[in-house]
């Protein structure tokens, strides 16, 4: 079985990068969740990990170059109503380093307890003779925040887009096996040497 991770952005077809459609391919349990966690690029909390175990495929779908979208496919689960989540990166025409806008998607969580993007806090409150339970929520770091693009930082989104296209999807197997090498450029080495000399 040959797993090819080379992506030609000018090719208009859809890439099912986990080879899910290959009849000879035997799915690897927790392949994508393990690869995403090992990449250490995203803030992934404990609830995220459980939900990502339901992730069966990640598809890279080229749009008008150099724009593209990423499709995350999940098996039916007890956390959210959707089985497909989509993130779209719209670039300035022919400018692969200039992101114009991004589009996420709405996620309908089964209930607040299943929502990994918030932390619930319950406390007892007394009003006269009545004692009631009050539940409040606080937004927290989560992988699934990438689909909320309401108040997004376009520079951070560009880094994310480049990570998916130029790094993660080309090296998914290495990330899964946790053998991905970290490459430093010459500037990084010079800065490291300067720090050592100062020490």
Locations of regions flagged by a protein language model:
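Mixed-charge, low-complexity intrinsically disordered segments
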Residues: 1-199
């Amino acid at each position: 079985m040959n797993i090819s991770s080379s992506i030609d952005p000018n090719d208009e077809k859809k890439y099912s990068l986990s080879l899910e459609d290959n009849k000879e391919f035997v799915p690897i349990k927790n392949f994508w969740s393990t690869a995403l966690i090992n990449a250490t690029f995203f803030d992934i909390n404990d609830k995220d990990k459980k939900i990502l175990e339901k992730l069966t495929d990640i598809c890279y779908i080229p749009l008008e170059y150099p724009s593209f979208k990423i499709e995350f496919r999940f098996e039916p689960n007890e956390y959210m109503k959707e089985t497909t989540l989509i993130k779209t990166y719209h670039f300035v025409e022919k400018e692969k380093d200039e992101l114009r806008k991004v589009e996420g998607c709405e996620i309908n969580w089964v209930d607040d307890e299943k929502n990994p993007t918030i932390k619930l806090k319950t406390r007892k409150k007394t009003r006269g003779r009545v004692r009631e339970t009050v539940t409040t929520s606080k937004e927290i770091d989560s992988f699934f925040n990438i689909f909320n693009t309401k108040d997004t930082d376009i520079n951070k989104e560009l880094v994310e887009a480049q990570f998916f296209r130029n790094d993660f999807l080309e090296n998914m197997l290495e990330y899964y096996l946790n053998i991905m090498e970290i490459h430093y450029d010459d500037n990084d080495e010079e800065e490291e040497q300067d720090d050592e000399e100062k020490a």
